[in-house]
């Protein structure tokens, strides 16, 4: 278990979670909020079941989310469509992405999409997801 101290801030970290399975969406949200609260951090998670909703919710000229957590198998356009869409906007293309999927990915890099981690949805633990989020946000938290 990693133990890094974090001074609480008033800043709210915003995550866009694209997941079409409501059980996984609720599980991811609940576990992340609990872990962030334990560290004195404010966390806002906006959940979307498809790419169209998420793209429509991206702020125009406002502060974008700090992180995308993305399942690639979604209803309608898939997660790769979302990655291509955000890659076409300079301000959005810099936002880190964590892919959470039951698919196996080839040994290739997705750095051009700013994918910082790929987690297996069926075997990952809440701690693994939290650690990946902390790493993606480049912050020190207690895991």
Q: Language model features by range: what are they?
A:
Residues 93-105:
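A short, hydrophobic beta-strand element within the central beta-sheet of small alpha/beta folds
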Residues 56, 80-93:
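Short amphipathic alpha-helix used as the core "switch/output" element in two-component signaling
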Residues 75:
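The feature encodes the CheY-like receiver
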Residues 45-67, 128:
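Acidic, metal-coordinating helix/loop segments flanking the phosphotransfer/catalytic sites
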Residues 50, 78-81:
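Acidic catalytic/metal-coordinating carboxylates
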Residues 81, 102-131, 135:
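Alpha4 helix (beta4-alpha4-beta5 surface) of REC/receiver domains from two-component response regulators
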Residues 70-72:
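Active-site residues of response regulator receiver
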Residues 1-16, 22-42, 64, 124-143:
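Non-catalytic signal-transmission and effector/linker regions of two-component phosphorelay proteins
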């Amino acid at each position: 278990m990693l133990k890094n101290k974090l001074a609480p801030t008033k800043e709210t970290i915003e995550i866009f979670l694209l997941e079409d399975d409501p059980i996984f969406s609720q599980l991811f949200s609940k576990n992340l909020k609990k872990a962030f609260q334990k560290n004195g951090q404010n966390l806002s998670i906006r959940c979307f079941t498809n790419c169209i909703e998420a793209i429509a919710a991206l702020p125009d000229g406002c502060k974008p989310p700090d992180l995308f957590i993305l399942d690639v198998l979604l209803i309608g356009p898939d997660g790769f469509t979302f990655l291509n869409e955000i890659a076409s906007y300079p301000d959005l293309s810099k936002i880190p992405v964590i892919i959470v999927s039951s698919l196996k990915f080839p040994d290739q890099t997705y750095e051009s999409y700013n994918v910082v981690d790929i987690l297996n949805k069926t075997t990952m633990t809440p701690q693994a997801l939290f650690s990946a989020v902390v790493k993606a946000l480049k912050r020190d938290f207690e895991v």
